[in-house]
Curated annotation (Swiss-Prot):
PANTHER family: GLYCOGEN SYNTHASE KINASE-3 ALPHA (PTHR24057), PROTEIN KINASE SHAGGY-RELATED (PTHR24057:SF0)
Protein's name according to its UniProt entry: Glycogen synthase kinase-3 homolog MsK-1
Phosphotyrosine: residues bearing it: Y235
Gene: MSK-1
UniProt lineage: Eukaryota, Viridiplantae, Streptophyta, Embryophyta, Tracheophyta
Xref: SMART domains: S_TKc
Length: 411
């Protein structure tokens, strides 16, 4: 990791992490001091201002370990593209290469490792935003900031939905299929290969290249390895996309919360607006009950056993085909219904979703974007993505014309 000195960024004092600190997250004091000293070894220029304003230049060094030569890299901040309690994300240009990157700057508690950085270092997938490198920056008040240098993707699924909504148009179905398929592929990878639950799937965290329509999952600030038997906080995930077990306050949830969130995103792509709008948890539960009906005692037990005696208003489920317009493909409605189940264990798993008939059009060798361009890469699986997958699933998953991309399958 490299180091940099920049002047203060005000206003971001929220301690990172979510209160779920394990033994592995804590740095011993002497190691913590040593690590930070090591990372400040090549102190870069201290920049006036907060380093995120247009025109500010941040100079850092990378390499210098395992025999690699040290390199100086300069980034010119261009504009802020996102901010929140975590800190700020800004677009920057590398002056040496001309490459545009996104830099996520977060306040770092010196006592703990940064879980987002630990997670990002494990990730390598075409549908997950990639970490290029990272560096620390310090302020005059000796606050430590972690800067994650990420690949830059210009659009979000949220803005694409807004675009069609403003035009009063439905999103072309090929885009709905493409975006949802790629989200499931990213989820299958992080759930099965890395063992991580994202915990904040929403259209704003789904980046999209407007030319190729390749989608990348971003923002692993809430992501966590879920260990069976270990409690997790339930106040996680953004409103509209929160699984009902989270609204019920469950602390022993599974990666099925991400699958519920994708169900909400898919419904929003189809409808042009959120399926379960609600400002507070109770409002959202009401919206969910209006669609799925009152959960049965057994379903409540699956979500949070402490609520089985709670008296809910008895409401019948609203048929899915009445929620969507008449011309909605039956496969789309079927997939939504398999994702938005009260019982987490009944929700379709991400890998199985990829073989759903809704995505059959994407497996057609003649499928093209409305512009006439080829589809983005959808079948360039790596061996670890498909480890342990039954042959019959593989046959459905990788169409014949794409099998040369996966020679390790021996199909």
């Amino acid at each position: 990791m490299a180091s940099v000195g920049v002047a203060p960024t005000s206003g971001f004092r929220e301690v990172l992490g979510d209160g779920e600190i394990g033994v592995d997250d804590i740095l011993p004091e002497e190691m913590s001091d040593m690590k930070i000293r090591d990372d400040r070894e090549m102190e870069a220029t201290v920049v006036d201002g907060n380093g995120t304003e247009t025109g500010h230049i941040i100079v850092t060094t990378i390499g210098g370990r395992n025999g690699q030569p040290k390199q100086t890299i300069s980034y010119m901040a261009e504009r802020v593209v996102g901010h929140g309690s975590f800190g700020v994300v800004f677009q920057a240009k590398c002056l040496e290469t001309g490459e545009t990157v996104a830099i996520k700057k977060v306040l770092q508690d010196k006592r703990y490792k940064n879980r987002e950085l630990q997670t990002m270092r494990l990730l390598d997938h075409p549908n997950v935003v990639s970490l290029k490198h990272c560096f620390f920056s310090t302020t005059e008040k000796d606050e430590l900031y972690l800067n994650l240098v990420l690949e830059y993707v210009p659009e979000t699924v949220h803005r694409v939905i807004k675009h069609y909504s403003k035009l009063n148009q439905r999103m072309p179905m090929i885009y709905v299929k493409l975006y949802t398929y790629q989200i499931f592929r990213a989820l299958s990878y992080i759930h099965r290969c890395i063992g991580v639950c994202h915990r904040d799937i929403k259209p704003q965290n789904l980046l999209v290249n407007p030319h190729t329509h390749q989608v990348k999952l971003c923002d692993f600030g809430s992501a966590k390895v879920l260990v069976k038997g270990e409690p997790n906080i339930s106040y996680i995930c953004s409103r509209y996309y929160r699984a009902p077990e989270l609204i019920f306050g469950a602390t022993e949830y599974t990666t099925a919360i991400d699958v519920w969130s994708v169900g909400c995103v898919l419904a929003e792509l189809l409808l042009g607006q959120p399926l379960f709008p609600g400002e507070r948890g109770v409002d959202q539960l009401v919206e969910i009950i209006k669609v799925l009906g009152t959960p049965t005692r057994e379903e409540i037990k699956c979500m949070n056993p402490n609520y089985t005696e709670f008296k809910f208003p008895q409401i019948k489920a609203h048929p899915w085909h009445k929620i969507f317009h008449k011309r909605m493909p039956a496969e789309a409605v079927d997939l939504v219904s398999r994702l938005l189940q009260y019982s987490p264990n009944l929700r379709c798993q991400a890998l199985d979703c990829l073989t759903h008939p809704f995505f059959d059009e994407l497996r057609d060798p003649n499928a093209r974007l409305p512009t006439g361009r080829f589809l983005p890469p959808l079948f360039n699986f790596k061996p670890h993505e498909l480890k342990g997958v039954p042959v019959e699933t593989l046959m459905k998953l990788v169409p014949e014309h794409a099998r040369k991309q996966c020679p390790f399958l021996g199909l």
